[in-house]
């Protein structure tokens, strides 16, 4: 997907070919630079040596729904299974090993970053991933998830995180409550279950802001900028 902390490392590999889903490429066009700028402001330590990055990562090839490539005799299937962490997430399935790389669609004991997400679609995308019954998943963060029991646990853990966040914010939005009230409601619902998860505190304000927007009918996530970050923090402190 298009997030700067995920795609900007591509230049280090010196790859002659870069493949993206067409939705992800469209998001680089629309908001790639803004994401780079806002992430740099939030996490400067992640951008050490940024001077060596030649610029935004652009694909040489794109596809709409699915694409197959071969690494020697090994088949690798690239698929857009639905909106979740972003509108343009793809997953990679390696059939001969029954392994899937899900990126940030699936996490295990790590918070999901939902600031550019689609809460209402995320569960269906998780169902699509589950239907492959893979033996291992490489998630967005942390160790590989080995065995179908752990894969299932991670998918359901992700579903609980996403649903708990959205349900609490949506109840506040439905009665015309404020972003600060949504923040309080999500904390009450999620802190007892998820407060010890990696990057939970970092993700929470962005997750609440996006859940609150989606619940009020904003389908396309608003672009994050330095100014929007400031406005969000001011609203949450109110």
Annotate the PLM regions.
Residues 121-181, 185:
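Divalent-metal (often Zn2+) His-rich catalytic cores of metallo-beta-lactamase-fold enzymes
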Residues 174-238:
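C-terminal regulatory/interaction regions
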Residues 2-7, 24-27, 69, 86, ...:
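Solvent-exposed loop/turn segments at secondary-structure junctions
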Residues 68-70, 74-88, 222-238:
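Charge-patterned, long linear interaction tracts outside catalytic cores
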Residues 1-15, 88-91:
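Di-metal (Zn2+ and/or Mg2+/Mn2+) metal-binding site signature of metallo-dependent hydrolases
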Residues 1-3, 19-23, 81, 100-103, ...:
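Active-site neighborhood of phospho(di)ester-bond hydrolases with catalytic His/Asp-centered motifs
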């Amino acid at each position: 997907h298009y997030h700067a902390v995920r795609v900007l490392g591509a230049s280090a590999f010196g790859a002659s070919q870069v493949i993206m889903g067409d939705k992800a490429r469209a998001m680089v066009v629309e908001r790639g630079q803004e994401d780079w700028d806002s992430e740099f402001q939030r996490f400067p330590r992640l951008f050490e040596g940024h001077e060596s990055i030649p610029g935004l990562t652009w694909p040489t090839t794109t596809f709409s729904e699915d694409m197959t490539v071969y690494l020697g005799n090994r088949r690798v299937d690239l698929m857009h299974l639905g909106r979740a962490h972003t509108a343009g997430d793809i997953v990679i399935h390696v059939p001969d090993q029954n392994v899937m790389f899900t990126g940030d669609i699936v996490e295990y004991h790590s918070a999901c970053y939902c600031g550019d997400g689609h809460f209402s679609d995320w569960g269906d995308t998780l169902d699509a991933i589950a239907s492959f019954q893979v033996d291992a998943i490489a998630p967005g963060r942390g160790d590989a998830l080995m065995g179908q029991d752990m894969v299932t646990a991670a998918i359901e853990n992700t579903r609980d995180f996403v649903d708990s966040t959205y349900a609490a914010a949506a109840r506040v939005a439905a009665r015309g409550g404020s972003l600060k009230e949504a923040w309080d409601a999500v904390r009450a619902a999620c802190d007892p279950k998820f407060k010890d998860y990696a990057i939970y505190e970092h993700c929470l304000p962005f997750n609440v802001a996006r859940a609150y927007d989606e619940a009020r009918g904003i389908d396309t996530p608003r672009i994050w900028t330095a100014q929007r970050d400031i406005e969000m923090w001011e609203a949450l402190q109110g």
